[in-house]
Amino acid sequence: MSGSGSRPGDSRPGDSRPGDSRPGVRIGVDVGSVRVGVAASDPGGVLAVPVTTLARDRRGNADIDQLVLIVRERQAVEVVVGLPRQMSGQEGRAVRLVRQYAEVLAERIAPVPVRFVDERLTTVAAHRRMAERGVRSRARRSLVDQEAAVQILQHDLDSRRGSAAPGVIGCAAPAAGPDGVVRAPRDGPRAPDGVVPPSDER
């Protein structure tokens, strides 16, 4: 797996910014171990909205089949996948699983590029926003993955337009170091009061 950005004709997912500069619909994806949240932008790349929640299918990849269909039906120009790095910035098992998922997706939708963005605390932010809207806990479970995908995509859209700093979604973004790499503080970002940070089991 290369850490560089996706290039035209290169189906490998990439981490670099900025992404594809063409106008058009972009798809945001929040990959969990149980469910996959999907969001989409308007063609102007201003607003992200929820699309659906897919059940993971590790054997038959039915969820990837549905994602491919969504990308094609909406004529998406790019797919943005949240990368659940640990609060320290290190990559654990969850990140490896997401990278593998994204590689399969990238091969299926090439030449549409697939790009990673840091999604730390995204699910926390999704839970918080739904709580603020009065969504009950039981209903929240079925919606949180879509909301997390919205958070991932909206932050990327805002960063692209220069109205949000690239970095951690759902909390204040740390400044980039001299080498241009964004790193979390030593103790990691602090979750909002009363909110339990998400686990990898989503």
UniProtKB/Swiss-Prot annotation:
Keywords from the named record: Cytoplasm, Hydrolase, Nuclease, Ribosome biogenesis
Database matches in SUPFAM superfamilies: Ribonuclease H-like
Major localisation: cytoplasm
Compartment(s) of residence: Cytoplasm
Region (Disordered): 1-27, 170-202
Recorded GO CC terms: cytosol
Annotated GO MF terms: nuclease activity
Domain of life: Bacteria
Top-tier EC class: hydrolase
NCBIfam families (UniProt xref): RNAse_H_YqgF
Similarity comment: Belongs to the YqgF nuclease family.
Protein's name according to its UniProt entry: Putative pre-16S rRNA nuclease
